Every structure is written in C-alpha cells, then in structure tokens.
A protein has these predicted regions:
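Short hydrophobic motif
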Residues: 1-2, 162
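Bacterial Sec-dependent N-terminal signal peptides
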Residues: 2-3, 19-44
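Bacterial N-terminal signal peptides that target proteins for export
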Residues: 2-13
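N-terminal leader/targeting segments
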Residues: 13-15, 19
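Extracellular ectodomain segments of secreted/surface proteins
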Residues: 34-90, 101-106
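Conserved positions within compact, well-structured domain cores
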Residues: 67, 75-124, 128, 140-328
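Short, solvent-exposed loop/turn segments at the edges of extracellular beta-sandwich modules
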Residues: 134-135
Length: 328
C-alpha cells in the first residue's frame, strides 16, 4: 500500500517541528472540476464526495459543487437533523482584506448535501462551510481548499509521499501563500495562520471577526463543544496539557488517529480524502526519511532550507505556531 502524507509546518522558537498528515489508501481524489457520474437527482453541482468523504475538499476552478453532509470520512454517519448551510469564513491567507462572498458566493443545504457556488472569478484561498439544525446549532463543518492541485513528493526509505505544501497553503513557492492554516491538536477545523513571514506577525485577514478564545472547562473542553463552535479557540488546560478538559480514549486515540493501532483515519482528521495524519516516533515519516540526520540547513525568515544529501535540497516554510492562549 502506498502512503501519502500531507503536512503542517510549525516553528517552535529556533527549532522547527513539522506535524505530518498521512493517507491510509492509494486511492486518489477525482480531479476536482471534473463531473463525477452520480445517480443523485441534484443537477448542476459537481459531487466532490462521490468517491470518498472527508473534512476538507480541494477545488481548483470555479463552479458549482456539493459535498455529502456526513461526519468526516464516515459516509454512513449522515447529519439527519441538518436543515440549513452557511459559509462561516473565507480568507486569501494573506494580509489582503476581503468580505463575505469573495470566494464562495452562495451555499445551501439540499437533500443531504451542502451545495455551494464559487465567485464568478475563481480565486485561491480557504473557506469553511457548516451544516446547521433547525435551531441554528452547527452540526458539522468542512474546509474548502481552493488551490491548484498539490503535487506529491516521494520520500526515501518507504517513509511516505508528502504533499508539496502545508494544509491550506495555496502556493508551494517560498512566499506568504505557502504558510497555510493552523490547527489545535485533534480538532478538524482550521484557524488563521500568519499573514506574512514578518517577525511581528499578524493573523491573515478573513471575512469575519473571530470569537474571543474560551478557557477549557468541563463544558467547553469537549469534542461536542469544539464541533459546535469551530471558530472558537479553546485555550490550554494546564492540568491536561491541551484544550481537552478530561482526557479519554476519544481524545488520545481517535482525535487524529495517531495512536490507532488499526491505522484508520479518524472522523476528526483535517486532511482531504486519500490523506491522513501519520504516526510519529520511530515509525513515523520524519524518522524514516532521515530528517533527524540532515547534513546541513540554512534558516531565514521564510523557512528552513535543508540539504538531505549532496544532491537533494528541500525547503519548509516558517509557518509559526499558535500559543496555548491562541496567539501567534
């Protein structure tokens, strides 16, 4: 089985930590923008979830799209009480301001699908759409990643195949659009990354004012709260070393699937279909690929330039990190 890996790069002080996302199958996402044969009566909307469902979907051209209103990669876990849909936020991932509708001009819920249309002039960026019940409660939300199709980079020693960019990045070149999005460990929904590589960083602009972070307590430090409040950062809990208030198997074993002995993709995994969060440690991609034995490296404000060998050089963006309080 071929392994595919996506990654989020994060800088920790002067040292760089890269959290990888790995796939469990070699099945690829159908080319976004191509019509997928589907017997469903909803016409005019390309079904991005026809082959497989996920918490993130890539599109690389304008049009009308739909995704199944299910929980992550579990196509059988249908949101039975969903009644409406909403765009929660949009962003170019930079310092450029934008208003609602800049990327996605309309969204609706219909017959078990979230249906949306992009702006007439397709632009690269990120958005999150949500399904709500009759009372307006968010039942689930999905990341819409608007970018050119990421390329695959195969790493040695059967370590895996990395994407050429961070999750949410709209560029693989050494520029501000390569930074990507930020995630709290185990949560499927993204937060804004920095707007640039400047040392005095600010969050990338988006179409909303983000809620004030909340402290983790018995009511907020739960998976249920995180799902219903995808734009709210839950601050660090000193007792449990994270946002989750009460440790349990639901958090440690299935949040992103890292310690799942079956190597199955968790429904909370933030990766697109065909990709997943990988294992760490000695059997992880970084150890196998030899990242701990890099010959030499050069660091500047944009990132790390590393010599894996005399003939192979790689670059990772200086994406920064979110503190336990939710600040850059």
């Amino acid at each position: 089985m071929k392994e595919f890996v996506d990654f989020i790069g994060r800088a920790l002080g002067a040292f760089f930590l890269f959290v990888a996302l790995m796939v469990v199958s070699c099945d690829k996402v159908p080319s976004e923008g191509d019509e997928v044969a589907d017997p469903d009566p909803i016409t005019g909307y390309v079904n991005l979830s026809a082959s497989s469902t996920a918490n993130s979907y890539i599109i690389n051209q304008g049009g009308s799209y739909r995704i199944s209103a299910v929980r992550g990669n579990d196509a059988s876990d249908v949101l039975q009480t969903a009644r409406t849909a909403e765009v929660l936020w949009e962003s170019f991932g930079s310092s450029l301001s934008l208003s609602a509708g800049a990327l996605i001009k309309s969204v609706l819920y219909k017959d078990g699908y979230i249906c949306f249309k992009t702006n007439d002039h397709f632009k690269k960026g990120n958005a999150v759409v949500a399904a709500k019940d009759e009372s307006g409660k968010i039942l689930w939300s999905w990341h819409i990643w608007m970018t050119d199709q990421p390329q695959e980079h195969v790493y040695k020693n059967d370590a895996g195949t990395l994407m050429d960019r961070n999750l949410g990045a709209t560029s693989a070149a050494p520029d501000e659009y390569s930074v990507g999005l930020m995630y709290q460990w185990g949560r499927k929904d993204p937060f804004m990354g920095p707007s640039s590589f400047d040392q005095n960083r600010e969050f990338a602009k988006s179409s909303i004012t983000w809620p004030t972070p909340v402290a983790s307590d018995p009511s907020t430090g739960t998976v249920e709260y995180a799902i219903a409040n995808p734009t709210t950062f839950i601050t660090y809990n000193a007792n449990n070393k994270g946002w989750y208030y009460t440790p349990s198997a639901q958090m440690t074993d299935t949040s992103w699937g890292w310690t799942d002995s079956k190597k199955e993709k968790s429904i909370y995994d933030p990766c697109p279909a065909g990709w997943r969060v990988p294992d760490g440690g000695r059997e992880g991609v970084w150890e196998k690929a030899g990242f701990n034995d890099i010959a030499s490296e050069y660091v500047d404000e944009k990132g790390v330039y590393a010599n894996m060998s005399s003939s192979l050089k790689i670059w990772f963006p200086n994406s920064g990190y979110l503190s336990g309080a939710g600040s850059l």
